[in-house]
């Protein structure tokens, strides 16, 4: 097993990684910015290293500082968590080149799956169903581009190859706006991702977001751990996640899961990963793969009993998968609500000092967070301050537990989205299950005209 690792992240995921390390007897090094010296995992870690000032660019995105921290503390591996450098192939490469283990896939795998065009090509080759599209980047010949759009059928969506998180995409409903949409997406992509390659896909009007969790050891073994539904979104950011996804039959789960596991073996995948799909009219369409642990991983842990972070650590230590596919069983249902420090009306971040705090509890309730009374939420980072996960023997029980837990949760001193989460849990259509990715924005009156 790994002797000592650097946790190259902050907030709740850093604490989650620290807990898994402690259970496995792994020593921990918490790297932090000057604004984060009071974070819970920093206070609990075996060693701490301040890697720079508050802005992420100078701390959590500062590759030389993170690698130096590993060197001076004698760590053997670096866990990137999610966000920040977790899907940065150059970081993974530099970590390995410096003699450390990157807890995640190989750099070339991150590169392959990070570029949407090469990722789609690899998935098609592996037999994973994809959205009908341009099968490669779009050129400058508008006659050819119009022909592609005609073959796919309007509406289509123009996407940046290096994009993600809802950035660098445009819906086109007819020939008249095609040329302008392509050039605008190109310009945006060049500015945001330094890569102006764009491609075209069929635009699905009312899909759900369903994703498959996978684990692969890079030694020819890969398993899928059922699916999650993350359709409750605002501005392409997930708000509520659940597992399993309502209405997905065991046959459908096996069909798509086996293809994802096979794809992992085909591309030599190592670690935890997630295949994201749009799901419409009983069909799955691959959109992207996240080559890291995800925010919503706890709902999968609750229904399968598999500790995904511990599995990541074991795989990084060179161990084969500790579970076989036939040992993965789905039991019950889990729902996760992301708790954000934000104004419930404007959705603007609401940093500040937490004056009073009480975490919910009870059977089937899990609270993943780094906050405490007296903790100051800094203005420099993502607004998520916690995740509330509730488990039940079925979906109705999980939702009922979540309603109670949300009402028990007290966070005073800052504004949060707890009331919004209560509204979602009480929403009839959500309770029925199967709402699409546009539902929450329509409910909030935010749908762009």
Swiss-Prot record:
GO terms for cellular component: acetyl-CoA carboxylase complex; cytoplasm; cytosol. The keyword DNA-binding does not apply. Coiled coil: none annotated. Pathway: Lipid metabolism; malonyl-CoA biosynthesis; malonyl-CoA from acetyl-CoA: step 1/1. Mn(2+) 1 binds at residues 276, 288. Changing residue 296 to A: Severe reduction in catalytic activity. Keywords: ATP-binding, Biotin, Fatty acid biosynthesis, Fatty acid metabolism, Ligase, Lipid biosynthesis, Lipid metabolism, Magnesium, Manganese, Metal-binding, Nucleotide-binding. Its cofactor is Mg(2+); Mn(2+). Changing residue 23 to R: Loss of homodimerization. No effect on ATP binding. Hydrogencarbonate binds at residues 238, 292, 295, 338. Acetyl-CoA carboxylase is a heterohexamer of biotin carboxyl carrier protein, biotin carboxylase and the two subunits of carboxyl transferase in a 2:2 complex. This protein is a component of the acetyl coenzyme A carboxylase complex; first, biotin carboxylase catalyzes the carboxylation of the carrier protein and then the transcarboxylase transfers the carboxyl group to form malonyl-CoA. This is Biotin carboxylase.
């Amino acid at each position: 097993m790994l002797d000592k690792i650097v946790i190259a992240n902050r907030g709740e995921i850093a604490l989650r990684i620290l807990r898994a390390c402690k259970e496995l007897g792994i020593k921990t090094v918490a790297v932090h910015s000057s604004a984060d010296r009071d974070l819970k995992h920093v206070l609990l870690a075996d060693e701490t290293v301040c890697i720079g000032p508050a802005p992420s660019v100078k701390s959590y995105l500062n590759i030389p500082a993170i690698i130096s921290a590993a060197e001076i503390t004698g760590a053997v591996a670096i866990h990137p968590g999610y966000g920040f450098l977790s899907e940065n192939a150059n970081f993974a490469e530099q970590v390995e080149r410096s003699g450390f283990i990157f807890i995640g896939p190989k750099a070339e795998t991150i590169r392959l799956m990070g570029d949407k065009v090469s990722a789609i090509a690899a998935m098609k080759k592996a037999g994973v169903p994809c959205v009908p599209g341009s099968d490669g980047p779009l050129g400058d010949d508008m006659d050819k581009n119009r022909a592609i759009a005609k073959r796919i059928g309007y509406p289509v969506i123009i996407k940046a190859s290096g994009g993600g998180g809802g950035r660098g995409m445009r819906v086109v409903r007819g020939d008249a706006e095609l040329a302008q949409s392509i050039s605008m997406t190109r310009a945006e992509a060049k500015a945001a991702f330094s890569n102006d390659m764009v491609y075209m896909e069929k635009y699905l009007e009312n899909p759900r977001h369903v994703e498959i969790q996978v684990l692969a050891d890079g030694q020819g073994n890969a398993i899928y751990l059922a699916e999650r539904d993350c359709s409750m979104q605002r501005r392409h950011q997930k708000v509520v996640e659940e597992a399993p996804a309502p209405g997905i039959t065991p046959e459908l789960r096996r069909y798509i899961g086996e293809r994802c596991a096979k794809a992992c073996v085909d591309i030599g995948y190592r670690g935890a990963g997630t295949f994201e799909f749009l799901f419409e009219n009983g069909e799955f369409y691959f959109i992207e793969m996240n080559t890291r642990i995800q925010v919503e991983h706890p709902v999968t842990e609750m229904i399968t009993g598999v500790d995904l972070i511990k599995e990541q650590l074991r795989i990084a230590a060179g161990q084969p998968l500790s579970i076989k596919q036939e040992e993965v069983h789905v039991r019950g249902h889990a729902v996760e609500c992301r708790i954000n420090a934000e104004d419930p009306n404007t959705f603007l971040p609401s940093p500040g000092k937490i004056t009073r705090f009480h975490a919910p509890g009870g059977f089937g309730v899990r609270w993943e967070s780094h906050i405490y009374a007296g903790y100051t939420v800094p203005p420099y980072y993502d607004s998520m301050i916690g995740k509330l996960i509730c488990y039940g023997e079925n979906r109705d029980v999980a939702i009922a537990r979540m309603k109670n837990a949300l009402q028990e949760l007290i966070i005073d001193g800052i504004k949060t989205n707890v009331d919004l989460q209560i509204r979602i849990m009480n929403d009839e259509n959500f309770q029925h299950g199967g709402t699409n990715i546009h539902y929450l924005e329509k409910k909030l009156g935010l749908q762009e005209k």
